[in-house]
């Protein structure tokens, strides 16, 4: 892989690690190590692979649009392609620069993008620009299909017996705020694209700015029902965790109180 190609791969992997998961969520990410053919059409090598985990939210369309933006600035002739597949051992997201020519033979039967996708062994979901648009078309007005008005996220439900992907469309509480944040994110990446297009020496990336923008962008997202569900579930899980911890700490006192109550009932029982 050429020096410029390596820099492109480095930057695309940084985008995934910075923006795919929610703030504070760690990603099990593996980048290509054998030199992906960056400028080859239909290559079988993914730029990076993310092992998806249970109960997580992934900002798929946001990362996809970011990739598309960077590649367009580099005058790359093809569109990115994301593939989520289940090989029986794990469910992974593989990010390609374009759709692999042997997607079916690699990842099995391709399922359509729906609200709930049951990802059985040797099945996959292939995501391109048209797939995001088609999924949103039945859920939002045509004027809201753009990146500033709605985005597709994926929430995972994984057990030992079933792998489920839930695709949701989220909309921002403030369109102006989201547009401003996205423009800031793209501006951070603009020097990267210029450097790659010109074969420059480096890719200036500020990890702190990236993390800050990630938190701000996800905070602005407001779902109709789906987003509220995400936030309510998060609050419920936090409250449940605090309640369990409180019960554990207080259990000696609680058990003593129950014992005294039982003794009192025995003493008060008429003979």
UniProtKB/Swiss-Prot annotation:
Provide the membrane-side ranges marked Nuclear in the record: 268-271
**Highest taxon listed in the record's lineage:** Viruses
Which keywords are on file for this protein? Host membrane, Host nucleus, Late protein, Membrane, Phosphoprotein, Transmembrane, Transmembrane helix
Protein name according to UniProt: Nuclear egress protein 2
Report the PTM annotation.
Phosphorylated.
Localization (cell): Host nucleus inner membrane
Q: Which InterPro entries match?
A: Herpesvirus_viron_egress-type
Instruction: Report which residue ranges the record marks as coiled coil.
Output: none
Segments spanning the bilayer are 250-267
Family according to the record: Belongs to the herpesviridae NEC2 protein family.
Assigned GO CC terms = host cell nuclear inner membrane; membrane
Bilayer disposition of the protein: Single-pass membrane protein
Q: Which organism is it from?
A: Human herpesvirus 8 type P (isolate GK18)
Assembly and interaction partners? Forms a heterohexameric complex with NEC1.
Q: What does this protein do?
A: Plays an essential role in virion nuclear egress, the first step of virion release from infected cell. Within the host nucleus, NEC1 interacts with the newly formed capsid through the vertexes and directs it to the inner nuclear membrane by associating with NEC2. Induces the budding of the capsid at the inner nuclear membrane as well as its envelopment into the perinuclear space.
Asked whether the UniProt record includes Phosphoprotein among its keywords, one would answer yes
Instruction: Name the Pfam families for this protein.
Output: Herpes_U34
- Per the record, what ranges lie on the membrane's Perinuclear space side? 1-249
Q: What is its main location?
A: host cell
């Amino acid at each position: 892989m050429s020096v410029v190609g390596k820099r492109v791969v480095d930057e695309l992997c940084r985008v995934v690690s910075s923006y795919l998961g929610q703030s504070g969520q760690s990603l099990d990410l593996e980048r290509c190590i054998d030199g992906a053919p960056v400028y080859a059409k239909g290559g079988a090598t993914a730029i990076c692979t993310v092992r998806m985990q249970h109960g997580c939210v992934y900002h798929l369309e946001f990362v996809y649009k970011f990739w598309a933006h960077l590649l367009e600035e580099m005058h790359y002739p093809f569109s990115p392609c994301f593939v989520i597949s289940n090989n029986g051992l794990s469910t992974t997201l593989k990010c390609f620069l374009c759709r692999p020519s042997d997607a079916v033979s690699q990842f099995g039967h391709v399922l359509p993008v729906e609200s709930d996708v049951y990802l059985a062994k040797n099945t996959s979901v292939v995501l391109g620009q048209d797939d995001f648009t088609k999924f949103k078309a039945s859920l939002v007005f045509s004027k809201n299909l753009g990146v500033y008005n709605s985005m597709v996220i994926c929430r995972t439900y994984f057990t030992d017996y079933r792998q489920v992907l839930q695709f949701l469309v989220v909309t921002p509480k403030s369109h102006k705020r989201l547009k401003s944040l996205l423009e800031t994110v793209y501006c951070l990446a603009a020097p990267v694209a210029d450097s790659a297009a010109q074969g420059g020496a480096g890719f200036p990336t500020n990890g702190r700015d990236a993390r800050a923008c990630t938190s701000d962008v996800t905070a602005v997202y407001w779902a109709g029902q789906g987003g509220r569900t995400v936030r309510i579930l998060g609050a419920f899980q936090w409250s449940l965790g605090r309640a369990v911890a409180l019960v554990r700490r207080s259990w000696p006192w609680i058990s003593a109180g129950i014992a005294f109550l039982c003794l009192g009932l025995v003493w008060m029982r008429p003979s």
